[in-house]
Amino acid sequence: MLLKCAQVLSESQKKCGIIVNEVGEIGIDNLQMKKMRFNVWEIFGGCICCTLAISLEETVHQLLNNYDLDTILLEPSGASDPSALYKPLEKSGYTTQKIKNIFILDPLRVDMFEAVLEPYLESSIPLANAVIINKIDVASAFELEESVRVIRKYSKDVPIFRINVNDVDSGIIKRILEG
């Protein structure tokens, strides 16, 4: 999804920086984005919402001061708490009004998320400017309905977008990013 957002921004003549937080040593997504000539800043060795918050702050500060960017795309690792990301972003000069928080929900695993990661859903979905239900091409009608139920449990009015990431309409991505 991050790659698709970068492509849409690039097609719209927007300059974007991409920050990816990888827990492992090698970022597979990062390699793909670099092959497509996107500049990617990688933050390794932990979660940017807690142990690497200073690294995030420094990276964003560097991007804002040294590059003429329209947008910074940020992909935290795994189940990072998005509320913990706001403070380092604000300290680096990014305003809360400029942050677009997009939550992506996998409908194939929504039951597991609700059973195991309920506190994460409870803190993440209310902060989201939009929620994307991904993999609609392989999810059952029941899984999609459950996904909407879970989203609405935590936010009654967040916009929900249903997509197949392999065949997503660029117009939908633009609406989400401009939202």
Can you say where each PLM-predicted feature lies in the sequence?
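Long, charged, low-complexity intrinsically disordered regions
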Residues: 154, 158-179
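Nucleotide-state-sensitive switch-loop elements of NTP-binding domains
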Residues: 1-113
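Short, ordered loop/turn segments at secondary-structure junctions
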Residues: 21-23, 136, 165
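Short, exposed beta-strand "edge-strand" segments with a Pro/Gly-rich flavor and a Y/T-containing core
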Residues: 66, 137-139, 167
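Short, structured coil/loop segments at alpha-helix boundaries
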Residues: 14, 114-118, 170
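Phosphate/Mg2+-binding loops and adjacent switch elements
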Residues: 71-162
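Alpha-helix boundary recognition
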Residues: 7-10, 126, 152, 177
